[in-house]
Amino acid sequence: MTVRVEIRETPGDQEAVLALAEAAAEADGVRPLNEQTLLALRYGGPSGARFLLLYDGDELAGFAYLEPSDPPSGELVVHPGFRGRGLGGRLLAAVLDTGGKGVRLWAHGDLPAAARLAAGFGMTRARALWRMRRPLTTPLPAPELPEGVRLRTFEPGRDEEAWLALNARAFADHPEQGSWTLEDLKRRQQEPWFDPAGFFLAERAGTLVGFHWTKVHAQAEGADGPIGEVYVVGVDPEERGTGLGRALTLAGLAHLRSRGLDQVMLYVDEANTAAVRLYESLGFTRWTVDVMYRR
């Protein structure tokens, strides 16, 4: 069979890619593609994004996606039925050649095979993202808002611009989140899971100063049934140290429990020790790890 890598500006056969990803998830116990990649498959990526499809003959054997960040970042996956033949290396070589110097790639689940592949190309571990979880069947402290702050929920058609401005302030040091555009937000508003009743905003004198956006998964790998998610918590830099982040987190957890959920998860950067300490103080424990490799 002839092996080739096609590099495209559009995703191509979305259904074949999703089927490949599902086969990998069943084999590895962890989903290989994150939300950003799945949205790019559905709607198309931003200008400069690249979709790499590895074919063995006419069969799709691997897939990779590169975001045009600085430096580029993305992820790749090889179908379980095509592993052990050097195709992962073939695809990774194409990714590195396409992305250029400093390419960053996520490996979900910290699997040994991914670590070996990365090491073989001189890539080193650059970041670790923890997935943490806690039961919602145990007691939750009541949220205590700072004086002068009130909570309400997100109103579509009214709050988008103010929320984007707050998100940029809150995540000025984390461009993956802080650089969100109106299009990024609207795409998520179109997703079946979006529920403004679970999108909490904190206001002080009419100005947004914090938020907690929750999410509900019908199913997640490793979870027995539906699970809630602390999707994003953000606090204005001027409000840090006031306890607002803790109060927002607790308000969202209470909402998820009111939905009948008995477990909740979140993602947090291993290096964000303040956030890790907060979540551990609220009963979260480490569940799985995603690793970013960089050359």
From Swiss-Prot:
Catalytic reactions of this protein: 1D-myo-inositol 2-(L-cysteinylamino)-2-deoxy-alpha-D-glucopyranoside + acetyl-CoA = mycothiol + CoA + H(+)
Residues in N-acetyltransferase domain copies: 5-141, 149-295
EC annotation from Swiss-Prot or TrEMBL: 2.3.1.189
Binding annotation for acetyl-CoA 1: 76-78
One GO BP annotation of this record: mycothiol biosynthetic process
Pfam families xref list: Acetyltransf_1 (PF00583), Acetyltransf_7 (PF13508)
Binding locations of 1D-myo-inositol 2-(L-cysteinylamino)-2-deoxy-alpha-D-glucopyranoside: 35, 176, 215, 229, 267
Binding annotation for acetyl-CoA 2: 233-235, 240-246, 272-277
UniProt GO molecular function: mycothiol synthase activity
Keywords: Acyltransferase, Repeat, Transferase
Family: Belongs to the acetyltransferase family. MshD subfamily.
Record's function text: Catalyzes the transfer of acetyl from acetyl-CoA to desacetylmycothiol (Cys-GlcN-Ins) to form mycothiol.
Summary of subunit composition and partner proteins: Monomer.
Protein name per UniProt: Mycothiol acetyltransferase
